Amino acid sequence: LRVAGLIESAQSGPNPCKSMELRSLDGGHRFAISQNLGPGSQACNLHPEGLALACAEVEQSIARGADVVILSKFGKQEALGSGLIDAFSAAYAADLPIMTSVSPAVMSEWRQFAGDLAECVTPDTAAQDSWLDGWLQDCMIGMRTHDRIGYPIARTITA
């Protein structure tokens, strides 16, 4: 199973804002996506360059060949057309299933992006395992997700 994607992790530190990074599931590379804006800053500390580099890595993984894409979340940045939206789009264009999480705050934007291909899965291990098992069975019998009418290509884990 060739997995492309990114997972997010946050480290607590002395600053009130957490230090965030994305880790590539393909190569294990780590991308800092937050920046220190100095003491007292109330601005968003998202680091666009780190996000762009991480997104490009996923796109390259998809181009090399992937079976499934896992992206940490479809959030505010993606809803605005930035962030990891190009990675989502590359997976969609390659007819690859996507597993991600979506905040209720941007669910309408997610549904607009994914259309009828999205299916919400509850955020528990059993539901996610069931989705993955079903997808793997389809692959074993030679079916791609887009060959099955009505079979969602994107799975959403909702809070």
What are these regions (language model features)?
Residues P123-A159:
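A charged, well-structured terminal subsegment
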Residues K73:
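Walker B catalytic acidic pair
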Residues A79-S89:
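Short Gly/Thr/Asp-enriched flexible loops that form oxyanion-binding sites at enzyme active sites
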Residues A87-P104:
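Substrate-engagement module of ASCE P-loop NTPases
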Residues L1-P39:
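N-terminal phosphate/diphosphate-binding loop that engages ATP/GTP or pyrophosphate donors
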Residues P104-A118:
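Glycine-rich, charge-decorated loop segments at or immediately adjacent to ligand/cofactor-binding or catalytic sites
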Residues D67, A118-E119:
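Conserved acidic residues
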Residues G27-G65:
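Helix-adjacent hinge/juxtasegments
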